[in-house]
């Protein structure tokens, strides 16, 4: 289950515009590192995107959350095709409508995963910061939300903004293209950002790992 056919990145604005062309290599991503469910537990079909991999009660893996409570995973989306810059998958079929929303960002794999009640409902290829403007790691509560935020620091629009730090690091919609990076924010495709914005709330936890 490969979720990205890799590439290089270059500097782009914290919003959606380009600021420069400094090129270097970054690793390609890989799927979430979780144990496979027992063979006798079949995957459940959940719609046009394929199947959901479910874990039996008592055998669910957990994902560490530095500075926060580990996330117990009940099911994952099965993504059988490579994901490229700008790609995302969103599928809530078969997932309870109630449950805490948790967001995980894996910088090394360039992936975001959105969970509700321990079930993965969305995943996307992301942009993140440069060595000079890195994306911070740790677990952060969502401090503020704005459907359309105008950055005064970079004079750029940041649609569907979820602010994570007091110095302006946020998740927001961006042009997720090969060769682009951010000034420390997490950039995600706009339609995916709209869905994340709609399912998240102030105080929900976002874990970012290197």
Q: What is each model feature region?
A:
Residues 2-51, 78-79, 86-100, 133-139, ...:
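Exported/periplasmic cell-wall-interacting domains
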Residues 46-64, 72-73:
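N-terminal, Lys/Arg-enriched amphipathic/low-complexity engagement segments
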Residues 62-87:
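Short, compositionally biased leader-like segments
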Residues 71, 125-126, 142:
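Short, surface-exposed loop motifs enriched in S/T, G, D/E and P with embedded aromatic residues
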Residues 89-130:
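A structural motif detector for short, solvent-exposed N-terminal "entry" segments of globular domains
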């Amino acid at each position: 289950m490969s979720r990205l056919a890799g590439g290089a990145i270059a500097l782009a604005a914290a919003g959606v515009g380009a600021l420069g062309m400094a090129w270097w290599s970054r690793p390609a991503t890989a799927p979430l590192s979780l144990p496979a469910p027992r063979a006798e537990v079949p995957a459940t079909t959940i719609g046009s995107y394929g199947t959901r991999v479910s874990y039996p009660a008592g055998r669910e893996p957990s994902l560490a959350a530095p500075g926060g409570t580990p996330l117990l995973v009940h099911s994952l989306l099965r993504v059988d095709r490579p994901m490229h810059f700008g790609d995302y998958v969103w599928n809530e079929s078969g997932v309870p409508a109630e449950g805490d929303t948790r967001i995980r960002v894996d910088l090394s794999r360039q992936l975001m995963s959105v969970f509700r009640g321990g079930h993965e409902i969305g995943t996307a290829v992301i942009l993140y910061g440069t060595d000079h403007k890195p994306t911070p790691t740790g677990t952060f509560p969502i401090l503020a939300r704005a459907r359309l935020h105008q950055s005064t620091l970079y004079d750029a629009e940041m649609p569907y903004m979820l602010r994570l730090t007091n110095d302006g690091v946020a998740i927001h919609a961006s042009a997720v293209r090969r060769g682009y990076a951010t000034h420390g924010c997490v950039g995600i495709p706009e339609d995916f950002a709209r869905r994340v914005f709609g399912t998240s709330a102030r105080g929900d936890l976002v874990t970012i790992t290197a």
